[in-house]
Amino acid sequence: MLISRNKLILLLGIVFFERGKSATLSLPKAPSCGQSLVKVQPWNYFNIFSRILGGSQVEKGSYPWQVSLKQRQKHICGGSIVSPQWVITAAHCIANRNIVSTLNVTAGEYDLSQTDPGEQTLTIETVIIHPHFSTKKPMDYDIALLKMAGAFQFGHFVGPICLPELREQFEAGFICTTAGWGRLTEGGVLSQVLQEVNLPILTWEECVAALLTLKRPISGKTFLCTGFPDGGRDACQGDSGGSLMCRNKKGAWTLAGVTSWGLGCGRGWRNNVRKSDQGSPGIFTDISKVLPWIHEHIQTGNRRKSSRAWCSEQDVIVSGAEGKLHFPESLHLYYESKQRCVWTLLVPEEMHVLLSFSHLDVESCHHSYLSMYSLEDRPIGKFCGESLPSSILIGSNSLRLKFVSDATDNAARFNLTYKALKPNYIPDSGCSYLTVLFEEGLIQSLNYPENYSDKANCDWIFQASKHHLIKLSFQSLEIEESGDCTSDYVTVHSDVERKKEIARLCGYDVPTPVLSPSSIMLISFHSDENGTCRGFQATVSFIPKAGKKIELPTLWFPVLILVM
């Protein structure tokens, strides 16, 4: 860990961030991730700048998730504990598979020159390197997972760091901390005692601009940059694989990045003219960019409890290409009153989620309900009642489910399965599932431009972001005509309860565009058993407008029932 001093650089962003880092921050009392024995120091102007300008030796127990990856008892890289059996490190640390059998992982490490009280050392059972990592381009996807042959026992000096929540990011200017036993000066010796240094996160534009000045410009998708243009504070050789950690809104330490690479140690890049003296920002693998991959491979303690009956306020990650979610997990279990349970479903990137209920027994939505949110927390609806909903296809790879119980109903339960499907698995029809989409696009009746089938019932729900309206524009419309459009027809609603009908269409004339007054649009197509036509084709677009807050719609089943 480089700790050489440099001239004082006054950054307003540092002052702004550190004001929030006060003694009033408190961590949960119950054992959980991101907790440290060392209390956060009260904020004051001089304390902050004394820490930013140089690195410093940490107090024992400051970062209980920090591990030392050792080859034949010699420190080579760092890592971060995220569960009793799993450690995250840099892929380049273990890219040579031949050395894995010679590696140990030591938790509770503080002073490399001695055996510290509370140290625990385990061997490695499994190594998982990100499939997109390449030694030819080692700065991209530089991350690996290590499964221990055994489990760390959590205590004062050993514990996990938090993984970020979905879509949780630490913005440019945020001051984070990296720690390790790396070299104290470029080309110098390793530090025997754990060191730390605080570094600001740079904007992507600053990062790219700095890297473009190098002799061999670096590109990638999964890294973030930290540091100061004039240098002086940085990670260094031996710190690789360690953590870039930031405090989240609740004050818990969260793994924002994995130490990856840098040109030199603490070199500035403001004047990268002479090739021999060029420097770069500190490069870290951005955890938010690879979070779905991490959850896909790691079974954390919480994940194994994904169906527990008492789960108030926890957010459980349930991931994989397919799986089941039963709540409660047994017919003999009941949840306590006034509970809130949260699950985040993750399927592989660039896939969509298909949900199918096999059991639903939840009383009126006024008391207990299961609500559903999309990517970016856009509300989809509430599920209640006893009639099974139709299968639901969600146009994203993530989904958040929230179950809320009242003070009396502790017998409600639901069972569902989830499965990853490729986009357009059932292209454009809306007839096999209730299809929920969050992007603009083209929809059309089943079999278009051929005739649609008899007895079709098809539904699409489009959900725009806040402050947007939805516009439906028809390219063609050929639907059996009736006086009041009750035989074959397209209906458009601005709610999912079908209470606010804004259009009912049939016949052979292309109608004018239909505009929903809200950020929700339900489009339905129905045909009877008496003859068919070509159907319709239309595009859906989102129009920016200062809008009202989106109220969470309620899906009162069996209202939205699809019948093939």
UniProtKB/Swiss-Prot annotation:
Keywords: Calcium, Disulfide bond, Glycoprotein, Hydrolase, Metal-binding, Protease, Repeat, Secreted, Serine protease, Signal, Zymogen
Coiled-coil ranges (or none): none
GO BP term, pick one: proteolysis
Domain CUB: 311-421, 431-543
Residues that coordinate or bind Ca(2+): E119
Residues of this chain annotated as glycosylated in UniProt: N104, N415, N451, N530
Entries under Gene3D superfamilies matching the protein: Spermadhesin, CUB domain (2.60.120.290), Trypsin-like serine proteases (2.40.10.10)
EC nos: 3.4.21.-
GO cellular component, one term: extracellular region
Function: May be required for sperm ADAM3 processing and consequential sperm fertilizing ability. In vitro, has an endopeptidase activity.
UniProt name for this protein: Ovochymase-2
Species annotation: Homo sapiens
